[in-house]
Swiss-Prot record:
Predominant location: cytoplasm
Keyword Cytoplasm in annotation: yes
Gene behind this protein: rbfA
InterPro entries membership: KH_dom-like_a/b, RbfA, RbfA_dom_sf, Ribosome-bd_factorA_CS
Family membership: Belongs to the RbfA family.
Subcellular location: Cytoplasm
Pfam families given in the database record: RBFA (PF02033)
Subunit structure: Monomer. Binds 30S ribosomal subunits, but not 50S ribosomal subunits or 70S ribosomes.
Organism (species): Lactococcus lactis subsp. cremoris (strain MG1363)
GO CC terms, sorted: cytosol
SUPFAM superfamilies: Ribosome-binding factor A, RbfA
Name of the protein this chain belongs to: Ribosome-binding factor A
Length: 119
């Protein structure tokens, strides 16, 4: 129970730091439009899934961003080690956040229902 609060705090800190590292340290143009939306940590803080979103919906941009993020994982871990005061930096796994697209799809469906009900 108490561990959940700690993992939530660490996840928020990791999210903030990775966003900062993306903006200030990573020079790869493939991650220019990447935004970290969430971080989920395991209870023992050994694994972190970092969810990201892109401004572009193109599949090729998504693949390029995923490749660039995977390539920069070492940089993220070393920077996190310098910035954070936890014993071990978790292993990072990047995953595209589908919730933004899902929310847009739901919004579109709801607008479609509203349009039909106006007839």
């Amino acid at each position: 129970m108490g561990n959940s609060f700690r993992s939530d705090r660490v996840a928020v800190e990791i999210q903030r730091e990775i966003n900062d590292i993306l903006r200030n340290k990573v020079r790869d143009p493939r991650v220019q439009d990447v935004n970290i939306t969430d971080v989920q940590l395991t209870g023992d803080l050994s694994q972190a899934t970092v969810y990201y979103s892109l401004l572009s919906n193109l599949a090729s941009d998504n693949e390029k961003a995923a490749t660039a993020l995977k390539k920069a994982t070492g940089l993220f871990k070393s920077e996190l080690a310098k910035r954070m005061t936890i014993f071990k930096i978790p292993d990072l796994t990047f995953a595209k956040d589908e919730s933004v697209e899902y929310g847009s799809k739901i919004d579109e469906l709801l607008r479609g229902l509203n349009d039909k009900s106006e007839y």
